[in-house]
């Protein structure tokens, strides 16, 4: 019985890593950055992206994500950028897990899991524009 071995995806020369603005050169250093700067342990990354804990662990070890996984990482990265504009980055991991009256007692991470991330984006818009919430 033949064993299928996944070959790592190669990047074309000269193409900049999509998350280079985070100081990351690969997905392992990107996830390390999230843990350090945003205080987001692996379970939080797992819940925000919808990845299994095992998938997050593999990415942390340097595995290249699928295009679907990369899209989820981009969406999470955009959310972290938005949240960083209204709070200290080191508070984000904690904030994501706290029940919030603005979200009817749900935690922001629960909103993401339920597909209601638009409620977080609306809150960010209101905070940044000075609109009453």
Tell where the protein language model's regions lie, with residue ranges.
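Non-transmembrane "mature" sequence context
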Residues: 1-133
């Amino acid at each position: 019985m033949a064993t299928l071995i996944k070959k790592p995806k190669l990047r074309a020369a000269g193409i900049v890593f999509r998350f280079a603005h985070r100081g990351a050169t690969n997905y392992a250093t990107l996830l390390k950055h999230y843990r350090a700067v945003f205080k987001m342990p692996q379970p939080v990354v797992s819940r925000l992206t919808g990845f299994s804990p095992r998938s997050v662990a593999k990415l942390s070890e340097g595995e290249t994500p699928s295009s679907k996984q990369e899209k989820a990482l981009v969406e999470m990265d955009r959310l972290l950028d938005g949240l960083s504009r209204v709070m200290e980055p080191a508070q984000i991991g904690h904030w994501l897990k706290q029940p919030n009256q603005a979200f009817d007692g749900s935690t922001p991470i629960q909103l993401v899991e339920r597909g209601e991330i638009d409620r977080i984006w609306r809150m960010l818009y209101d905070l940044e524009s000075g609109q009453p919430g």
